[in-house]
Every structure is written in C-alpha cells, then in structure tokens.
C-alpha cells in the first residue's frame, strides 16, 4: 500500500528570543502646546576659494582660510536644556517622572547674495589634447600640461539631523602582502565612510575621491580638490539607519554636463589588449611611417559644467515643515543638538581684487606686473527654526530603549541610582597630592567629553535665541498660518455679523367666519 510522505528538509525554527522592536519617538514622546522660535544672526565667512593662504615664515599659520562654494558647511546648533527652563506653570510636567526634549517642526535656510558661477582650474592641468575635435595625431613630450579652468557641477543640498551626516569617498586601500605590489602598480581602492565636517569638499564632477593620495601627478584635478578629499553623503547608509538621527530629511538638486573631452598624458598603466599582435579585436595597426604607428594615450576624461543657474530652481530661502521624518526619530533633538549640513555653489561668485604695487601715478601706462591680483569668496547664511516642547516619560521600557539607543541621553539627564547610606565611618585624607599620602582609591570624576571634539563644525549657540512669541518672527507667522494655531490654541473665534441679527416680527391672524 502506497502512502504520501512530506518532503524531508530543514525546519525553520524561530529565534530563541524575540527580535527587539525599535520604537518610534511618537509612540512614547508626548507633544505639548508650547512652540518656540529660534533664529541666528547673519553668518558670514570670507576666504580664498582654492586653498588656504599660509605664512611663509610659519607654514602652519593660516593667514586666509579656504572658503569655497563647493565646500560643505556643517552647522552645529547648541539648543538650551528645556529641563532648566523657568516655566510659569510649575505643574506643567513632573521632573521626577518626565523629561523635556525639543522636536523640530520647521526650518528655513536663508542664503544671501546674488546668484553666481565661480570657476576653478589648474595652471598645470594634465591635458594632452582635445579629443572632441582633434586636428592632428599629436605626439607626447615630457610635459604637455596646460592652464585649464572650468565651472564645477551645480549642487544644492541640505541634510537635517541631530547627529553629523555620514559621508563616503573612495580611498587607497592596503594591498595584499602576497604577491607583493611592484613600484608603479595601481593600488587597490576601497569605500570609506566618515563624518562630513565643515570645510570638506563636495563632489564637483570628478567623483568622491581622495585626490591627495591617488593622484601623484598633482595635475589631474582643479586646485581646490587636488590636495584634499571630495566627499558625498552616504544616503544609502543614513537612509537605512533604523533610528535616523543623522537624517531627518534632506533636499538635493544636482546638474551638470560634459563640456570638454580631453585625454591624459603619461604612460598607460593598463595597456590595450593585444597591442602588438598581428590581429586585434580593438584596432588595426598603422604603417611604420605614419604618426598613428605609436599609439596615443587612451585615458579619456571630460570636464564638468554646471550650466545655467536660475532662481526658479533654488532649494533655499523657503520654509520646510517636518511632519514625518524618514526614520523612527521624528525630529527629536537628542542631547539638545541639531546639525545642518549643506552645500550650495549657485551663489559661487569669486571676487577678484587688484591692488597697485608699483609704478608712478603721473602719466602712468598700464603694466600688468604693477598690479597684484587677489581672489576672495564669501558665504552668507541665516537660519530660522520652529521647535515644539515634548515630554518623555521615565518608564522602565522607555529608559531601556534609550539606553540601548544612546546611553549618553540618560547620562545627560543625570539619572543615577541613589547610593545607600554609609554603614560606618570612612577615612578622608587632606593632602591627596602629597607624596606622604597614599594614592586616592578613586579618581575624581572628570568633565564629560564631547563625542565630536575632534571634528570641525561651525558651532552656533542658540541657548539665548528662543522665543515663544511666534507672531513676532517671519517663520513663526507662517507656521501659525499653516498649522491654524492662534494664541497657542487650535480654536478659532467665530465672528457674527450684525446684519444677521434676529428681529421680532408680528404676524396678523385672521378670524375664521362661523357658518350659520
């Protein structure tokens, strides 16, 4: 008798412990009816757009910093501690069972100055020839570098979060010890993640790349990137972060096209396949007397161009309202920190300043060497914010969740266990640093270290810039209009017109005739 048997195979067993679920901030944080406006002063910076100008006598002393329109500007805003606010109503929240946090509700990034295009370039750029419209088959010499300039890729971008944005770039990697690499071999490269700091260069059309480590000729990129690293925000990594602290939301707009097509000079590290065979799949060889007999270089590159800059495509100077963030953190500024990372090279005008250094004033005829030429670039910003005051309950589940997410949050709230009272008398020495006294058993508590102390940011203190009078500020009035808030309430008074007032009117009644 035949019988059916199920397919024998591996049986899926659930994990022994349930997978922890990450809570969204809206699940355990309660919003209040208190909203605050915060704004900055006009933030200005001036410098050289290509490189920092250093002192000749002291090379480590920077006289003029590097300020480029293609640099990342990373603002770190220090918010006031809401738990130390002197609120009018003492019963607003229970400090023994709750803590107050800030929630970002609106932001406007203001950019000052007119639109402009700033060019960059290199006086000794590795341009062997123009491959778009060649007029002959050129032969290489020892030095074919040319003075070339271009306009960078047009980029507008901002990233909002409570931790620094994460960037990516391709860098030189360590080769395998076996087989040992030879001098002149192409090194391996790897993708590297790092925080985006203030002053880091954004991609200008040549890629997110470590030019300083991987371009030994120092002539294959413009001056503003040849000695540094170009980074690009790792949106894939930040977007997949379950907490989403580094990326509440972002705005991005890129534009470029290839304007010119060049070829590099030098020895080709990767030769064409079968270059000297009788038959080749890639080309047919030339005769001995022809210039084409010696193959030219085949490292082709294009120069980028950002093209038209228009006010119709601006991401800045307009408000953004945060209703739902991309991660589980819906705009909560943990540790009273807010990071704004941005780059905008549509306001990229470089000022050329000429100063007369030599030559008589009377009957003077122009001579170029009598004038010194300088280059400066300026950046102008102004920002406004709308924050909502929220309450965090100090329950066991919430504190356990915060401890796994970021233990520093609980440390900053000074949530410590009360130690038991001493059971007996203890010894206390007077001169702890004396050689006659034994070393202390416990080191005194040191001040808490900043987790970003080694990173460079544009720090802006907003501790004294908060105001609850939203109607006195431009962004505050727009927020009140958008959300329907009037005097802190959603209720709107209904105005009754006097023309609709009720009037008493008398209606005459007729008597019915009685029938006889």
Curated annotation (Swiss-Prot):
Pfam families: Late_protein_L1
Compartments it resides in: Virion; Host nucleus
Biased segments, Polar residues type: 497-506
Residue ranges with Basic and acidic residues bias: 139-148
Gene3D superfamilies reported in the protein's UniProt record: Major capsid L1 (late) superfamily, Papillomavirus (2.60.175.20)
Disordered, as annotated region: 129-148, 497-516
GO cellular component: host cell nucleus; T=7 icosahedral viral capsid
Keywords assigned: Capsid protein, Disulfide bond, Host nucleus, Host-virus interaction, Late protein, T=7 icosahedral capsid protein, Viral attachment to host cell, Viral penetration into host cytoplasm, Virion, Virus endocytosis by host, Virus entry into host cell
GO BP terms: endocytosis involved in viral entry into host cell; virion attachment to host cell
One Gene Ontology term of the molecular function aspect: structural molecule activity
Ranges of biased composition (kind: Basic residues): 507-516
Record's function text: Forms an icosahedral capsid with a T=7 symmetry and a 50 nm diameter. The capsid is composed of 72 pentamers linked to each other by disulfide bonds and associated with L2 proteins. Binds to heparan sulfate proteoglycans on cell surface of basal layer keratinocytes to provide initial virion attachment. This binding mediates a conformational change in the virus capsid that facilitates efficient infection. The virion enters the host cell via endocytosis. During virus trafficking, L1 protein dissociates from the viral DNA and the genomic DNA is released to the host nucleus.
Similarity field: Belongs to the papillomaviridae L1 protein family.
Quaternary structure and partners: Self-assembles into homopentamers. The capsid has an icosahedral symmetry and consists of 72 capsomers, with each capsomer being a pentamer of L1. Interacts with the minor capsid protein L2; this interaction is necessary for viral genome encapsidation. Interacts with protein E2; this interaction enhances E2-dependent replication and transcription activation.
Protein name: Major capsid protein L1
Species the sequence originates in: Human papillomavirus 4
Higher taxonomy: Viruses, Monodnaviria, Shotokuvirae, Cossaviricota, Papovaviricetes
Gene behind this protein: L1
